[in-house]
Structures are given as C-alpha cells and as structure tokens.
C-alpha cells in the first residue's frame, strides 16, 4: 500500500494509523521520492492524500490548485499500478461548488468511480499538526472569514485516519466527521476568543451520509481549542 502525500496533515495521520494496524506494508510517498515509488511495482491500495487543503490559496491560484488536485488525481490513476484507489477529498466538494476549491475537488472525485475506488470526504478536523483554519484563527483572536452561524462537524484527525484505515475495502463515497455539529460562534464564545466573524458567508460543513453512534461529538473541539489557547498564552 502507498500513501501519496504522507507528510501532509491527513497523510501523516493516516500513515501512522495504517502502521498501527499492522495489516499493511505501508509505503509513505512524498514529493522527493514520488517517482522512485511509482516505478517500484504494483500496490494493493493507492491512497491519494495529497490534494492541498488551502481554500483561499486555491481562489488566488486556480491553475496551480487544478494541477495539484485534478491533474494529480488523473496522473495517479493513469500512471501508477494499483488494485484499489482511495481518494481523500473534502465535504467542500459538495458544499462549496461556487468556489475553485470545491469545484476542483468535485471534479477530481468524478474520476474515482467504479468498484475499485472509494472516495472519503473529510469535514473539519483538529489535533495532530494543526496549523491553519478557523480554529487557528480563533486561537489567535484573528478574524474568521465565515459566519458564526456556520455549523461544523469538528473531528480529531487521528480518529478520521483510523476510520479510513478500517474501511479501505469500502466503495462509493462517504462523508466523515463528527456525528454532531457545533456553530463557530459557540466554539468562539466557549473559549473566550476575540475573533470576529464574516456576517454573510455561512460555511456549513458536516456529513450527510450515514454517521455512527461511536463517531465523535463535535463539541469536544472546545476543550482542545481551550487548551491550545492556554498553551499559546504561556508560550508568549
């Protein structure tokens, strides 16, 4: 099995989850060794966790985002040898089709049809090597470019990675995140952040495919973010 984008936020967590399962011989693939591993042989499972997660960058650099998302997915499917293909995508492929980011991820998903493919749309995450996004903005009291009314299904990245590792034989499409939602305003107010929200952009991000009773509670993000704010205050 090969994980493309193994040094990224999701890719690193997924590589660790797969290694813990001891079920697979996992090959982490980054930019520097991409070609070496491409020509090394056939893989039982090829996981594409390399699509960038930079929404605002995508709007500013649509050509680059297309190359890193749509073109990369096509090249992986055509130029690597694999038996199963798992595409790590985003709920934005459904909710943000009015943006470059959402459209490109939806287009990449459409290449991944058939019984040998599985598309996982991830919702908002936290934990791990989290550095950017609405939670980082709230931790630093920066403006958040979404409405406080936005409902999101925050889930730990390690939990998401573990779920993917346990469902590699699935097919079709699944949206993965917390089983509940919390508004951005509820998170901000609970941790005492001074962030201000954009009034008109409601960015709802939560699964509409089936969730499970053992899936995370989105409100758990509050304790995580509160701890991050305390750690940041001590460091400064």
Protein language model features and the residues they cover:
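Mid/C-terminal beta-alpha module of Rossmann-like enzyme folds, strongest
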Residues: 163-215, 222-236
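N-terminal Rossmann-fold cofactor-binding loop
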Residues: 27-35, 124
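Conserved Rossmann-fold NAD(P)-dependent oxidoreductase catalytic core, especially the SDR/UDP-sugar
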Residues: 74-103, 118
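NAD(P)H-binding glycine-rich loop region in Rossmannoid oxidoreductase-like domains
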Residues: 33-76, 91-95
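Short-chain dehydrogenase/reductase
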Residues: 4, 8, 62-67, 98-109, ...
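NAD(P)-dependent short-chain dehydrogenase/reductase
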Residues: 102, 111-153, 157-159
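Active-site beta-alpha turn of Rossmann-fold NAD(P)-dependent dehydrogenases/reductases
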Residues: 50, 86-90, 121-123, 177
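N-terminal Rossmann NAD(P)H-binding glycine-rich loop of SDR-like oxidoreductase domains
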Residues: 1-24
């Amino acid at each position: 099995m090969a994980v493309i984008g193994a040094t990224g936020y999701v890719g690193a967590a997924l590589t660790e989850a797969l290694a813990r399962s001891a079920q697979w011989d996992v090959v982490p693939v980054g930019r520097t060794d991409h070609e070496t591993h491409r020509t090394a042989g056939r893989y039982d499972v090829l996981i594409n966790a390399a699509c960038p997660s930079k929404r605002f960058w995508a709007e500013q650099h649509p050509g680059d985002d297309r190359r890193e998302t749509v073109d990369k997915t096509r090249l992986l499917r055509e130029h690597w040898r694999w038996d199963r293909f798992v595409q790590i995508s985003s709920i934005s492929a459904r909710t943000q089709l009015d943006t470059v980011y959402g459209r490109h991820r939806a287009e990449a998903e459409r290449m991944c049809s058939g019984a040998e493919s599985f598309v996982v749309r991830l919702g908002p995450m936290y934990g791990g090597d989290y550095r950017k996004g609405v939670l980082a903005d709230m931790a630093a009291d920066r403006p958040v470019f979404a409405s406080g009314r936005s409902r999101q299904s925050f889930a730990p990245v390690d939990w998401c990675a573990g779920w993917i590792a346990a469902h590699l034989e699935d097919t079709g499409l699944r949206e993965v995140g917390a089983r509940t939602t919390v508004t951005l305003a509820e998170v901000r107010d609970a941790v005492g952040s001074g962030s201000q929200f954009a009034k008109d952009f409601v960015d709802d991000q939560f699964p509409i495919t089936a969730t499970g009773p053992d899936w995370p509670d989105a409100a758990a993000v509050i304790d995580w973010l509160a701890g991050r704010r305390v750690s940041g205050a001590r460091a400064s």
